Design a protein with these regions (language model features):
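N-terminal maturation segment of proteins
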Residues: 1-173
Length: 173
């Protein structure tokens, strides 16, 4: 356990710079533990999944860090995984723990992922040919279908049941 090992270090024996690093590391570890054990965003915050889904595609396509054909191939690989991520979101989110404003925002933002697929990725499909283009088109079609299914779940299951308080509360904080 890293936190236990860190607490065993005599901080007074460290240089000032290493004391600062040790404090940063300890705070980061404690924050991670709190996030996992107490906050549990995956269970109540649908925007956590929105950030994963949208960010996985948007950051890939919005920055020219690699040639476009390579980024399109990577986008196909990510789109192939997106249906499983959305299924996991439906499995992990506990609608009664979701605040209504979060559910409403999610319902409005989820279609944005489709616009990334259609307007940023598929609009560039002519950069690929043959099997690579076919893979991109198939991945986009499956991704769009999964996003439609997910939108239906958001509107019919998540939003009607989202009643939780959006504040963390004194006990958890």
């Amino acid at each position: 356990d890293t936190l236990s090992a860190l607490s065993g270090i005599d901080k007074n024996q460290l240089s000032r710079a290493n004391q600062v690093d040790a404090a940063l590391l300890e705070n980061n570890l404690r924050s991670g533990i709190w996030s996992t054990e107490v906050n549990q965003q995956w269970a109540w915050n649908p925007l956590y999944y929105q950030s994963l889904a949208g960010g996985a595609l948007y950051t890939l396509m919005s920055r020219e860090f690699a040639p476009l054909p390579r980024r399109l191939e990577n986008a196909a690989a990510r789109m192939e995984k997106l249906p499983a991520l959305l299924a996991q979101a439906r499995s992990e989110l506990q609608p009664a723990r979701v605040p209504a404003p979060h559910a409403a925002t999610y319902a409005q933002q989820n279609p944005g992922v489709k616009s990334i697929v259609n307007d940023m990725i598929l609009a560039q499909k002519d950069q690929l040919s043959g099997a690579r283009r076919a893979r991109l088109e198939a991945a986009a079609a499956a991704c769009n279908a999964a996003l439609d299914e997910h939108q239906h779940w958001i509107e019919t299951t998540l939003q009607p049941a989202a009643q939780a308080d959006y504040r963390v509360g004194a006990e958890a904080f």
